[in-house]
Amino acid sequence: MSEPRGKKTHDDMWDSGTQGLITRIAVVAALAGLLFGFDTGVISGALDYIGDAFNLGDIGKSAVVSSVLLGAVVGSIVAMAIIDRIGRRRSLIASGAVFIVGSIASAVAPGVGALDIARLLLGVAIGISAVAAPMYITEIAPAARRGQLVSFFQLMITIGILVAYVNDEAFSSNGQW
């Protein structure tokens, strides 16, 4: 069935000058992937310091690292429940708020239990954003550019991991393993 005369389709709007706006919105939404990658990778450089500060053995360090993964599972389940209810954009905003709370809580954690909870919160944000961001980008993108725009999310995850490792190296006290 053809579109009524004079009514613009999603793809027509892409051609009529909104290309830059949609691309910018997609890149901003994909920044959730940057946070995903950064919060996943940054622990590697901090783990020895955390272990020393909280007197952790291997199991304690494993709990700190894996708490973000457990949170991501919880976050993806939460995302299934809220995305259709509040929308993809609001879900991304909510995950951004959880990223902020989790990051601040991680920075000021007085003990390993608080750090585990903070990292669990970061994982929840990762889980929500990993579901919401690609869906949101898919919905705003015209069919001809959908794959390209959605791939920004994965690119941002990779860039986030790279930034985390560069950050880890910059703040390490020595250049050895």
Language-model-derived ranges and their functions:
Residues 2-177:
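Transmembrane-helix signature of 12-pass secondary carriers
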